[in-house]
């Protein structure tokens, strides 16, 4: 991979990881507003949060295996697409059921983003660039848990649906970038 393409690829991967991890933490400040809007119990609210986490854990090995079979481009697009579809379900939800399904779909899609990004870095960058890039990837993931509640608090005055609506244009840009930048098939790691 030429350096120019690598400079464009890494922000694409980092942004995807940030978006997926952010939505785990961004929902915290919105939980009371969601609870009030739908009249759901605290137990139902925990289901809303846990659906994301559980489906993310399920999605991680399945979407990573899908990436191994189909290549990172399609798997990343599917992961981001599922995440966006779940976000859209949350935006249009008029009842708690669609909220649960939306969080589950969103979490499942998010499950593929990090492992695919890590695999692309491992398979496309030269060895001397892999460690720093993977370190930044991990930092971005961790940073999301600091940024998430802050962003949630900033967007909440506009309505809790904005926490999920903001994902849609970002996902569209990520999908367009993946089509252009991600390899269709996994490349063998370079030994140079």
Locations of the language-model features?
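Transmembrane-helix bundle of Major Facilitator Superfamily
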Residues: 1-181, 186-187
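Membrane-interface "helix-start" segments
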Residues: 189-192
């Amino acid at each position: 991979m030429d350096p120019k393409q690598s400079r464009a690829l890494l922000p694409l991967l980092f942004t995807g990881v940030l978006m997926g991890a952010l939505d785990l933490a961004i929902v915290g400040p919105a939980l009371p507003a969601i609870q009030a809007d739908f009249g759901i119990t605290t137990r139902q609210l925990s289901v809303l949060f846990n659906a994301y986490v559980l489906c993310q854990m399920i999605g991680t090995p399945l979407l990573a295996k899908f990436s191994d079979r189909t290549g990172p481009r399609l798997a990343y697009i599917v992961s981001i697409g599922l995440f966006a579809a779940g976000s859209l379900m949350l935006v249009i939800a008029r009842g708690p059921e669609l909220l649960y399904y939306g969080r589950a779909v969103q979490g499942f899609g998010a499950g593929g983003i990090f492992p695919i990004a890590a695999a692309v870095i491992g398979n496309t960058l030269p060895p001397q660039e892999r460690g720093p890039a993977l370190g930044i990837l991990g930092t971005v993931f961790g940073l999301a848990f600091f940024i998430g509640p802050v962003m949630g608090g900033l967007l909440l005055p506009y309505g809790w649906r904005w926490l999920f609506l903001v994902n849609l244009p970002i996902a569209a840009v990520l999908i367009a970038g993946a089509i252009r930048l991600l390899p269709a098939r996994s490349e063998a790691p370079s030994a140079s």
